């Protein structure tokens, strides 16, 4: 169940991270759904039998996966590709792997294209607005990581039971499956992907 919460949350973050301009409605749909997931997840953590909270999370799952929030915007699925290599090599559940990779991906984006990540940080986690978008984005990534940890999710390779991840092996497979570049929000090279894996250690 916690893995599914991670997966749903990461699906919404993926749809939220776009360079497409003038998508305020779908921005708000993504961010509102993320806010609801977080609120209801905390309720379920405190009250595991809370039917209404669980029902709202299931509704969020439907919204996250039915494409509504991605209408009219270019999405970025690079974090999924990065995670697929973890699942393939180490037999890790997809949601667990995303809980590890996505905050690392966000931290990388904070340096290279912070605008949408900073917006996410402000609108979802109430990070104060600042002219330093990188700082805002890093704070948002840290808050998401804290949320995942509070929910009992792994947030690093060691917490997946992977003491020494074979990053070279993952990159060889990633290049074979996706080519030299992947993603849309920032086009990632294999060097960039190595850094994201490193940030997830």
Where are these regions (language model features)?
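Single conserved hydrophobic/aromatic residue that forms the stacking wall/gate
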Residues: 1-14
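Residue-level recognition of oxygen-bearing side chains
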Residues: 12, 97, 101, 162
């Amino acid at each position: 169940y916690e893995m599914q919460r991670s997966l749903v949350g990461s699906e919404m973050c993926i749809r939220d991270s776009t360079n497409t301009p003038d998508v305020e409605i779908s921005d708000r749909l993504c961010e509102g759904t993320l806010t609801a997931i977080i609120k209801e997840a905390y309720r379920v953590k405190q009250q595991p039998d809370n039917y209404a909270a669980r029902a709202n999370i299931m509704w969020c799952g439907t919204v996250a996966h039915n494409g509504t929030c991605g209408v009219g915007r270019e999405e970025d699925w690079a974090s999924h590709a990065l995670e697929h290599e973890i699942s393939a090599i180490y037999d890790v559940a997809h949601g667990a792997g995303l809980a590890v990779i996505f905050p690392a991906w966000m931290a990388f984006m904070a340096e290279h294209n912070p605008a949408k990540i900073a917006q996410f940080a402000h609108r979802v986690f109430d990070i104060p607005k600042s002219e330093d978008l990188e700082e805002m984005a890093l704070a948002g990534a840290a808050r998401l990581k804290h949320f995942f940890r509070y929910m009992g999710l792994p947030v690093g390779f060691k917490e997946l039971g992977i003491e020494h991840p074979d990053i070279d092996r993952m990159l060889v497979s990633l290049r074979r499956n996706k080519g030299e570049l992947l993603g849309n929000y920032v086009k990632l090279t294999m060097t960039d992907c190595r850094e994201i894996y490193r940030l997830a250690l």
